[in-house]
């Protein structure tokens, strides 16, 4: 009982201490306009240092990563079919594919896969 209470207290205190230390170390003094502006050989910059980024491209990249991970998770299925219960493996894989298909249909209807607009 005492060991559980002690481990719970440690589990609560360690993240609080780490967050507190990060907050103290990350706090900055008053921001100076010159310090926060980009530096270009001592002169004012000719253009902005921030390049605009298309959020549609970012969303499409995230969708690609999700479906790429799907393929990685489906690759061992032929090997698993030989070593385990076929019904359980097929049921699990069909459920997995149905969830991903529902996600794909949702993305399609939402227009996230339409690059032209």
Swiss-Prot record:
Q: What GO CC annotations are associated with the protein?
A: mitochondrial membrane; NADH dehydrogenase complex
Q: Which organism is it from?
A: Lumbricus terrestris (Common earthworm)
Membrane-crossing residues?
5-25, 57-77, 86-106
Role noted for this protein: Core subunit of the mitochondrial membrane respiratory chain NADH dehydrogenase (Complex I) that is believed to belong to the minimal assembly required for catalysis. Complex I functions in the transfer of electrons from NADH to the respiratory chain. The immediate electron acceptor for the enzyme is believed to be ubiquinone.
Q: Does the keyword Repeat belong to this entry?
A: no
Q: What is its EC number?
A: 7.1.1.2
Tell me the GO molecular function terms: NADH dehydrogenase (ubiquinone) activity
- The principal location of this protein is mitochondrion
The annotated topology with respect to the bilayer is:
Multi-pass membrane protein
* Name of this chain's protein: NADH-ubiquinone oxidoreductase chain 3
Q: Where in the cell is it found?
A: Mitochondrion membrane
Keyword set, alphabetical order: Electron transport, Membrane, Mitochondrion, NAD, Respiratory chain, Translocase, Transmembrane, Transmembrane helix, Transport, Ubiquinone
Enzyme class of the recorded protein, top EC level = translocase
What family does the entry list? Belongs to the complex I subunit 3 family.
Catalytic activity as recorded in UniProt: a ubiquinone + NADH + 5 H(+)(in) = a ubiquinol + NAD(+) + 4 H(+)(out)
